[in-house]
Design a protein with these regions (language model features):
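N-terminal export/assembly segments and adjacent metallocofactor-ligating motifs
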Residues: 1-234
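Internal, active-site/partner-interface "lid" segment
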Residues: 233-245
Length: 245
């Protein structure tokens, strides 16, 4: 049977990179990022490149996986998985205290699954728990609404290829957002890159200027910058009057 190309999108994040799946005999043979697609243009992160593994690496992806002695992932039964999870959690809590283990939810869970996770974690295991929204988009939504009056960033990836200065605050796109960083690398204006981060991250190493503030000092820095701009009268008063509250 001839090789068939099926074009689709990666479902791992909201960037929605375009992917070409090369299929033969109803089996995925290879995964290739789509050339010329405006979002990722022939590039995607390691997660997208391994999209086929969930269908081809294991004969039955419904069963849970555990890492074996050789470092490879192996399928086990659900009964085994429950016993391993319970024994490992109990072992850690007995050795280090109940607060030594915590759980974090995910936006992929249904409401019922989320309630069950919280019930077991808090009431039976005495664990601390949190939602993925603290690390994901919930905080961004609040900040975007307060800053721009809308719950989404007011820019596109194209801006990263056109800007002459780029500032990253607490972000490490070299590792955490390779698609975005690819757009930065495509910028032909040789932009100045400023990274504000306590960590000397991979992005900070590549920056023109690294501002290594103390942890939790980002708000203090931003308020100071805002105050300085106001004092120097370097703000666009007409724009602020028209578009902010």
């Amino acid at each position: 049977m001839d090789m068939k190309k099926v074009q689709s999108t990666c479902n791992y994040c909201s960037i929605a990179c375009n992917i070409d799946f090369n299929v033969e005999d109803n089996e995925i043979v290879s995964v290739v990022p789509t050339q010329g697609y405006p979002v990722n243009n022939g590039f995607c992160c390691i997660k997208g490149l391994n999209l086929d593994k969930q269908n081809t690496k294991f004969p039955n992806p419904v069963y849970p996986l555990v890492r074996g002695k050789d470092g490879e992932m192996e399928q086990i039964s659900w009964d085994e998985a429950f016993k391993v999870m319970a024994s490992k959690i109990k072992e850690l809590q007995d050795k280090y205290g109940r607060e030594s283990v915590a759980f974090i939810s995910t936006g992929q869970l249904t409401t019922e699954e989320m309630a069950l996770l919280g019930h077991i974690g808090r009431n039976y295991l005495g664990m601390n728990g949190d939602g993925n929204t603290r690390l994901c988009m919930a905080t961004s939504v609040v900040a975007h609404k307060q800053s721009y009056g809308f719950d989404a960033p007011p820019y596109t990836f194209d801006d990263l290829e056109l800007s002459d200065t780029l500032i990253f605050i607490g972000a490490n796109p070299v590792v955490a957002h390779p698609i975005l960083w690819t757009r930065v690398r495509n910028n032909k204006n040789n932009p100045k890159i400023i990274v504000i981060d306590p960590r000397q991250s991979e992005t900070a190493i590549r920056a023109d200027e690294w501002v290594d503030i103390k942890p939790k000092a980002d708000l203090r820095l931003l308020y100071t910058l805002a105050n300085y701009l106001i004092e120097k009268d370097w703000i666009d008063k007409d724009y602020i009057e028209k578009y902010t509250e």
